């Protein structure tokens, strides 16, 4: 009994101290203050407006800072922002939020005086971010410019759940119906998918089962690892390190890319992959799940209201040469350029703007920004885990996607959030099974080195952004043509593909990476 009283006293004291700390921190201003924010939003947000997000409404009350939101759809955000910057007669917003703006563009805008260097203001006005910046070395490599500038703040991810986004999700009913073990190799996977394709596991008497569904990018990024490709993680396509030689390479030039294309062609032509993957991707996954047709999914989380019917596995699929990399593994940075202050922000409001966003880099502020208001949208259960409240769950309709549901409460869906994603942010999303999966993938299947987002010089960036994109698009288009039967993969077509690739001068891309990686890791270091 005495112990229980002591625990209760400690908890009460902690809560009181926490409330005191928050009371001292807020409001952020002594008089009414307004910030104008241009934000990128997706269709899953209520009326496509961040104004309607409950966590942000609550934060306006707490901070005393009123936000005039300019919500711009993600389909036109880039063009809209570029047009406003190009029009010298248009006043820019104080802040550009969730833009996922690349370092090369940030550096260019910074040199032109369009955006503000945040570095001089951070230590005093953004202590939460400054602490992360000094504790996690990959952050500085990702956001610090050539002369020490910091033009924008990133989305930081510390939890394994967010660092290993693409996982293989299996439908429990489908697996029980075919009576087979979970696949551990590509050969196993083919056998399981074939059995599912022919099973009528949903029992409706129709051959309407969807085997594996994914976006085209998730498909590539997941299966590359089974062929020893893309061995330096999620932030860098096209260039990696050969796991056998340790040399930099453009991995589309390796023979294993041919093996990959051959395997995926067989999967597609045998209808073991969703046939509209190149046109619809995974957009219909929730619909197929609701109609009891979906068997497997490559995604961060289970589809729709998957519940206990979906589970994931703690390994990557082993390929023909023994590779089983989980190449869709991130460093501590999800994306850069998610909080940018423009030249039109009044100088006296720059500290206020940074204090406003800095709360999102604390554990309490992160939860508010991403999943909403504690006690109203989510709660801490007796076992210490976090879960949606009954009130929040009551808003969910059968046809509502995970993103649309979460977007009512916080800015999580769509990414590009200037915040820190801590581990087990919400156990309703990342319960024991997917959390264990993420930990296992990060520990046992991630490449031995994950390249962070890199700040390239202007010359390097010109090569990486243009040539890298051209090569990536060329290779993926070749794979799609072969998979769909538009082109047959023979020795001659493979040789022609390699000849065209060589004409694109991939050595320039490798040289740019070698120069940048030497700055990151040091002269003579292993990349």
Residue ranges: model-predicted function:
Residues 2-3, 11, 15, 19-527:
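Extracytoplasmic/secretory soluble proteins
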């Amino acid at each position: 009994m005495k112990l229980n009283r002591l625990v209760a006293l400690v908890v009460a004291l902690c809560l009181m101290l926490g409330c005191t700390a928050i009371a001292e921190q807020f409001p952020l201003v002594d008089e009414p203050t307004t910030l104008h924010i241009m934000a990128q939003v997706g269709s899953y947000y209520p009326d496509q407006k961040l104004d309607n997000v409950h966590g942000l409404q609550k934060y306006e009350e707490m901070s005393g800072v009123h936000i005039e939101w300019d919500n711009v759809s993600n389909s036109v955000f880039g063009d809209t922002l570029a047009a406003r910057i190009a029009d010298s007669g248009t006043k820019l917003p104080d802040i550009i939020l969730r833009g996922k703006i690349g370092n090369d563009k940030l550096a260019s805008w910074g040199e032109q005086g369009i955006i503000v260097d945040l570095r001089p203001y951070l230590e005093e006005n953004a202590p939460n971010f400054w602490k992360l910046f000094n504790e996690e070395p990959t952050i500085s490599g990702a956001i610090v410019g050539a002369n020490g500038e910091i033009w924008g703040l990133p989305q930081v991810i510390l939890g394994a759940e967010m660092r290993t986004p693409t996982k293989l999700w299996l439908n429990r009913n489908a697996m029980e119906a075919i009576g087979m073990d979970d696949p551990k190799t590509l050969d196993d996977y083919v056998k399981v998918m074939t059995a599912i394709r022919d099973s009528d596991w949903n029992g409706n008497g129709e051959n309407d089962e969807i085997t594996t569904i994914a976006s085209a990018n998730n498909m590539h990024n997941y299966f590359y690892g089974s062929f020893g490709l893309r061995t330096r993680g999620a932030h860098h396509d096209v260039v990696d390190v050969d796991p056998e030689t340790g040399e930099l390479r453009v991995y589309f030039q390796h023979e294993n890319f041919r093996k990959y294309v051959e395997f995926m062609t067989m999967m597609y032509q045998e209808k073991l992959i969703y046939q509209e993957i190149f046109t619809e991707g995974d957009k219909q996954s929730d619909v197929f799940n609701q109609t009891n047709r979906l068997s497997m999914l490559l995604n961060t989380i289970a589809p729709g209201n998957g519940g206990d019917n979906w589970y994931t596995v703690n390994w990557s699929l082993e390929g023909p040469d023994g590779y089983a990399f989980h190449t869709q593994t991130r460093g501590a940075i999800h994306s850069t350029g998610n909080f940018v202050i423009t030249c039109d922000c009044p100088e006296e409001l720059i500290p206020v703007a940074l204090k406003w966003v800095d709360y999102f880099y604390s554990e309490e502020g992160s939860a508010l920004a991403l999943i909403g208001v504690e006690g109203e949208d989510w709660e801490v259960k007796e076992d210490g885990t976090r879960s949606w409240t009954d009130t929040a769950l009551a808003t969910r309709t059968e046809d509502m996607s995970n993103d649309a549901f979460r977007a009512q409460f916080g800015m999580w869906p769509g990414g590009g959030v200037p915040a820190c994603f801590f581990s087990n942010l919400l156990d309703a999303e990342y319960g024991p099974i997917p959390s264990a999966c993420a930990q296992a993938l990060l520990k046992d299947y991630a490449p031995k080195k994950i390249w962070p987002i890199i700040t390239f010089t202007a010359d390097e960036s010109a090569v990486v952004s243009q040539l890298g994109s051209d090569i990536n698009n060329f290779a993926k288009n070749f794979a799609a043509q072969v998979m769909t039967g538009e082109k047959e993969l023979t020795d001659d077509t493979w040789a022609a593909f390699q000849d065209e690739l060589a004409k694109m001068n991939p050595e320039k891309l490798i040289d740019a990476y070698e120069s940048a990686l030497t700055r990151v890791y040091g002269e003579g270091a292993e990349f």
